């Protein structure tokens, strides 16, 4: 029986590289690509099947920044499959990133320069906006849409006889100081991306606490500094091209500069091969690339408090109740 893998954000960047790498590891998989743009997803599916003709690749339309789209997409997944073996929660945004020049010039002459470039800590601010659902866009896209997706797909994911895995694309940029239980959407702050990724780490801990006994395990990863649409929003592609020699040099000191989506997907692929029961739920798995170009995975203990994680999880459950009432009313009117 083919293992079924659902990947959000599968049509570009890390998600696209992950698809190719998983099929290279096991072309007997059924990959389900959850994407907003059907034509783009179709082109990806055709390319994957051309290189891996024995695989099965399907598409479900889903926009994780739109909760009705998430629910509709999940219903379609439940119609097609009886179980999911892997759910890669990879889709994400960093809208309108602004470089903090003061922090940049202060940091570049400090002893923390390598850490600053590896994590972008304090370097980037973003201008968030409100979605049609009434949420902060970064919070809904990076975290809450995925949370609703997990809740919708629980019947396909929870099988104690044969565990399923949730695998998140988080970030080294996840900082405790940018998250607050009083403002989980980071509406009052300027670093919603960092906040959403720290929230991802918290949710990961809570999901393991609440679902391991049901056969569902969750892990978080960081792809490192990768050239994707996300980073091209910070600086134009030609600037990154000019910086590549410097980045390759930095690799000898900081292995977070994975650069390519293929390298960045290393931890995501590594987790595909692990027994989830053997993994530490308080560890984030980091993709790394050495100065000589060798890829590897390193575990890093997360700066998370389990009680805070549980409180955050309960807050999300309350938010979910409100959302379901709104969606039911909308469906009734339509």
Curated annotation (Swiss-Prot):
Main localization (coarse): endoplasmic reticulum
Active site residues per record: 193 (proton acceptor)
Metabolic or biological pathway: Steroid biosynthesis; estrogen biosynthesis; Steroid biosynthesis; zymosterol biosynthesis; zymosterol from lanosterol: step 5/6
Enzyme class: oxidoreductase
Glycosylation sites noted in the Swiss-Prot or TrEMBL record: 37, 178, 229
GO molecular function: 3-beta-hydroxysteroid 3-dehydrogenase (NADP+) activity; 5-alpha-androstane-3-beta,17-beta-diol dehydrogenase (NADP+) activity; estradiol 17-beta-dehydrogenase [NAD(P)+] activity; prolactin receptor binding
Record-listed substrate binding positions: 171
Membrane topology annotation: Single-pass membrane protein
Subunit structure: Binds to the short form of prolactin receptor.
Name of the featured protein: 3-keto-steroid reductase/17-beta-hydroxysteroid dehydrogenase 7
Source organism of this protein record: Rattus norvegicus (Rat)
């Amino acid at each position: 029986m083919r293992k079924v893998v659902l990947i959000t954000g599968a049509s570009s960047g890390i998600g696209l590289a992950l698809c190719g790498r998983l099929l290279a590891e096991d072309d007997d998989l059924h990959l389900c690509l959850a994407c907003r743009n059907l034509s783009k997803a179709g082109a990806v599916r055709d390319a994957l099947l051309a290189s891996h003709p024995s695989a099965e690749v399907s598409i479900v339309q889903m926009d994780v920044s739109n909760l009705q789209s998430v629910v509709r997409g999940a219903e379609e997944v439940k119609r097609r499959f009886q179980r999911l073996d892997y759910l890669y929660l990879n889709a994400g945004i960093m809208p309108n990133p602004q470089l903090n020049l003061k922090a940049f010039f202060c940091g570049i002459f400090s002893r923390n320069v390598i850490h600053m470039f590896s994590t972008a800590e304090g370097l980037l601010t973003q201008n968030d906006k409100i979605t049609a659902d009434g949420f902060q866009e970064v919070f809904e896209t990076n975290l809450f849409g995925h949370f609703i997706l997990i809740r919708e797909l629980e019947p396909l994911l929870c099988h104690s006889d044969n565990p399923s895995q949730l695998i998140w694309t988080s970030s080294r940029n996840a900082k405790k100081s940018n998250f607050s239980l009083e403002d989980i959407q980071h509406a009052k702050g300027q670093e919603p991306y960092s906040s959403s990724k720290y929230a991802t780490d918290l949710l990961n801990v809570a999901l393991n606490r609440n679902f391991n006994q049901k056969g569902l395990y969750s892990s978080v990863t960081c792809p490192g500094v990768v050239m994707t649409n996300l980073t091209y929003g910070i600086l134009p592609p030609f600037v990154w091209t000019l910086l590549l020699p410097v980045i390759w040099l930095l690799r000898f000191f900081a292995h977070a500069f994975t650069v390519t989506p293929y390298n960045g997907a290393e931890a995501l692929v590594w987790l595909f091969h692990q027994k989830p029961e053997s993994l530490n739920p308080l560890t984030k798995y980091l993709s790394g690339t050495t100065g000589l170009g060798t890829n590897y995975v390193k575990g890093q203990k997360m700066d998370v408090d389990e009680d805070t994680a549980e409180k955050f999880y309960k807050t999300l459950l309350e938010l979910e109740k409100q959302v379901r009432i709104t969606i039911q009313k909308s469906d009734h009117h339509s």
